[in-house]
Design a protein with these regions (language model features):
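A short acidic, helix-capping loop that chelates divalent metal ions and anchors anionic groups
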Residues: 46-50, 83-87, 93, 128-133, ...
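Alpha/beta catalytic barrel-like cores
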Residues: 20-31, 42-45, 87-91
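Histidine-acidic metal/acid-base catalytic patches
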Residues: 1-13, 20-37, 60, 67, ...
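Glycine-rich, proline-tolerant flexible connector loops at the mouths of alpha/beta enzymes
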Residues: 42-63, 124-128
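Flexible, glycine- and charge-enriched loops at secondary-structure boundaries
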Residues: 52-59, 94-98, 130-137, 167, ...
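Active-site beta-loop-alpha junctions enriched in small/polar residues
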Residues: 15-19, 42-46, 78-80, 125-127, ...
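Short, conserved active-site loops that position catalytic residues or coordinate cofactors/metal ions
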Residues: 34-48, 75-86
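Active-site acidic/histidine proton-transfer and metal-coordination neighborhood
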Residues: 25-26, 67-68, 72, 82-188
Length: 285
């Protein structure tokens, strides 16, 4: 299947966090058959464990397959419970002891280099108890600065993702953080279209335009305004056609990957319906 959207400069992909009941090779086979042209690879169980002694070799093998398929790849780092079996997404970059998170992100950068990834996507985390926003921002700037240096050395850009409920919640927050760091070339933005429904004051079009040329990665899903819950297209309030039109107007050339991490029970069906919805929205833009 040729796949893709006719005339689009960006590639459609799918997130592996929506295929956690499939071995990674099988997920790739399914997505290729459905017409996707890239993958957002979430590191950790069950697909590519960055702390496994064979991870580099596995990444090199994956790189060969992606190259054969002509696929784009981005690295996602939102694995639940990878670093702490009791606390989701902890430690984060705001915690007192963030060493394990920083190690994980350095491994993500290294694996991204092996895979030829467009970028490594990351986020701030929620504000820990008893840490002031000012102190948390100081920690984030200091720790992110070191990761930006690592990304520059590896030749793999970082893409910072604003997340509802986190310290860095909006595109404006992410742009301010980048400015605080001196606007490094190796630090761009990830924008999740569904998040825009929840937290962006100017909606999805305004958020994408604000990110503009700094946009390195796009996650595609629907949401309702009141809840940070990833939904299939048509089950939320996202104007998908307007979002795709804006990406086209911005001449976005990266990956736009569907992110539905709670839908693995019907992954092939969800991926097929998502492709159909994307094709219809593209035609309607």
């Amino acid at each position: 299947m040729s796949g893709g959207l006719p005339g689009a400069g960006f590639a459609l992909g799918y997130g592996t966090n929506g295929f956690t009941d499939h071995p990674l090779d099988d997920a790739i086979t399914v997505l290729d058959r459905l017409g996707y042209r890239g993958i957002a690879l979430t590191l950790g169980h069950p697909h590519l464990d960055p702390f496994d002694g064979e991870a580099d070799r596995a990444a090199a093998r994956l790189r060969r397959r992606f190259d054969d398929l002509g696929w784009r790849v981005v690295i996602e780092t939102g694995t639940r419970y990878l670093l702490d079996p009791f606390r989701k997404h902890r430690p984060n970059l705001l915690d007192d002891d963030a060493d394990l998170r920083e190690l994980f992100l350095r491994r993500a950068i290294d694996l991204g280099a092996i895979l030829g990834a467009d970028c490594v996507s990351l986020w701030s985390g929620v504000l820990p108890d008893e840490v002031s926003p000012e102190a948390a921002h100081d920690r984030l700037r200091a720790r992110l600065d070191g990761l930006v240096g690592r990304a520059e050395e590896a030749g793999v850009p970082l893409a910072f993702e604003p997340e509802p409920g986190m310290l860095v919640e909006t595109v404006a927050d992410a742009l301010a953080l980048r400015a605080d760091l001196g606007d490094p070339d190796a630090l761009g933005l990830t924008v999740d279209l569904g998040h825009c429904v929840v937290v962006e004051p100017d909606g999805v079009v305004g958020a994408l335009r604000a990110a503009g040329p700094l946009l390195r990665n796009v996650q595609v899903d629907d949401m309702l305004p009141a809840a940070h819950e990833h939904l299939e297209f048509g089950h939320g309030s996202l104007d998908l056609a307007a979002a795709l039109r804006t990406l086209d107007e911005l001449d976005y050339r990266g990956l736009a990957a569907v992110e539905l991490p709670r839908h693995a029970h019907d992954a092939p069906g969800v991926a097929a319906r998502s492709m159909t919805a994307l094709e219809h929205a593209w035609e309607a833009r």
